[in-house]
Every structure is written in structure tokens, then in C-alpha cells.
């Protein structure tokens, strides 16, 4: 039997994710490094969680590294035209969150705007297709069809999402061969992305409560591209 966590506890963990993205939206600048971004996130998470036991892990990748999906922070220096992915998992108390947003240093190119719109549409179709009783392996194919229809077929090599809560990553994941059923009370993520290896990549991820009727979004944070453009 799966361990279930309350949506209220997940939302408390997500308060730290929200603070982290706010810190980046106001604090990111050209000339900063991935490690600088990490420190902004650390300060924000620590401020929200205070003395409560907590930790965080995540992907802090900028520039062409975004096309390789994931990685720890480095001394890479952000420059105009870069993208930056923050995929952040926070443990607050005994419960984990897991979200992702992508930042743009300057106005995104037309192709990047099209890719981002495809990512959001991909997430939306995932939301429409998941409810209690859904077979996990059935979720990703419609997401991939959305990307292909918009010109980005084959550009998402990873799963479409997974369970979260007692740990930052739990099965079932939304991937081929994972034929477990999603259950009411599960907390899941949907994390579509588009990756142009050697150039750039992007990803958006939210956390949801699985119900008999569908998904309840637990992270009502902005996801529109204009909210994540860093002035250069």
C-alpha cells in the first residue's frame, strides 16, 4: 500500500518553492552564476522553513546545459540569450514537493516561444488525462503527440511525471512499461519539456492531488513565459 500525504502538507512544502522562484524572478541578473542562483534559492527556502527540519535538491542548469536536462549548479556565468532551469524539490518536515520553471535572459526567440507554448499545452493534456484509475503508462503518449503536432517530436526524452510526497521521486512514473494505476490521494507531478541538445532546453512542472474526477493543482504559481523573462 502506498504511503499517502495530505495536500495541506504538500502545499506547505510548496511555499518554499514559491519563495525560491520569487527570489529568482527579482534577483537573477546577467553576470551571475548558477551557484549564485543556488544561493538565492537556499536563502529563500531557509527563510520560509525557518527552524523546521528541511532540505532541498534540484537541477540548476543554464546556457547550453539546459539542453542536457539536468545537473548541479556550477560556476557557469549567465549571459544574454541564455535559459536557466530550476527544478526544485523541497522537504519541509517529512513531505517533499517537486516543481520546475524555466527562466529566459532576454526576450525568447520565436522558436523558444513556440516550444514553451507546446510545453504548456503538453502539461494541460496531461492534466486532462489523469485521474484515479489511470494507467501510468497511458499518460505520456498523448503528451508526446502534442509536442509532435507542434513541431517538437522526439524532444522530450524523459518521463512525463511521477508521484511525489513521501520522497521527491516515486513510482509509478508516467513512462512506457509502468502499468500501475494512479490512485485517489496520490500526489503526482507533470513535467513536460523540450530540449535542443547543445543549444537550449526548457521544462515546467507542477504538483497535483489525484482525485476520482481528475487532478487538483496544488501549485497555482504563474507559468506564462512573460513571467520568467530576466531583463538584460
Language model feature labels by segment:
Residues 1-232:
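Active-site neighborhoods and metal-handling regions in enzymes and metal-associated proteins
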Amino acid at each position: 500500500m502506498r504511503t499517502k500525504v495530505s495536500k495541506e502538507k504538500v502545499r506547505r512544502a510548496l511555499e518554499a518553492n514559491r519563495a525560491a522562484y520569487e527570489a529568482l524572478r527579482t534577483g537573477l541578473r546577467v553576470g551571475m552564476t548558477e551557484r549564485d542562483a543556488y544561493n538565492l534559492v537556499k536563502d529563500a527556502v531557509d527563510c520560509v522553513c525557518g527552524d523546521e527540519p528541511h532540505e532541498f535538491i534540484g537541477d540548476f542548469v543554464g546556457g547550453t546545459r539546459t539542453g542536457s536536462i539536468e545537473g548541479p549548479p556550477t560556476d557557469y556565468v549567465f549571459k544574454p540569450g541564455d535559459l536557466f532551469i530550476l527544478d526544485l524539490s523541497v522537504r519541509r518536515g517529512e513531505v517533499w514537493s517537486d516543481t520546475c520553471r524555466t527562466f529566459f535572459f532576454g526576450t525568447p526567440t520565436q522558436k523558444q516561444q513556440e516550444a514553451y507554448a507546446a510545453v504548456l499545452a503538453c502539461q494541460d493534456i496531461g492534466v486532462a488525462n489523469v485521474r484515479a484509475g489511470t494507467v501510468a503508462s497511458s499518460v505520456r503518449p498523448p503528451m508526446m503527440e502534442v509536442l509532435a503536432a507542434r513541431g517538437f517530436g522526439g524532444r522530450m526524452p524523459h518521463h512525463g511525471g511521477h508521484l511525489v510526497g513521501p520522497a521527491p521521486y516515486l513510482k509509478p512514473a508516467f513512462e512506457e512499461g509502468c502499468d500501475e494505476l494512479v490512485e485517489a490521494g496520490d500526489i503526482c507531478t507533470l513535467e513536460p519539456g523540450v530540449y535542443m541538445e547543445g543549444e537550449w532546453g526548457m521544462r515546467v512542472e507542477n504538483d497535483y492531488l489525484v482525485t476520482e474526477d481528475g487532478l487538483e493543482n496544488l501549485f497555482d504559481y504563474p507559468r506564462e513565459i512573460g513571467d520568467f523573462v530576466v531583463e538584460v
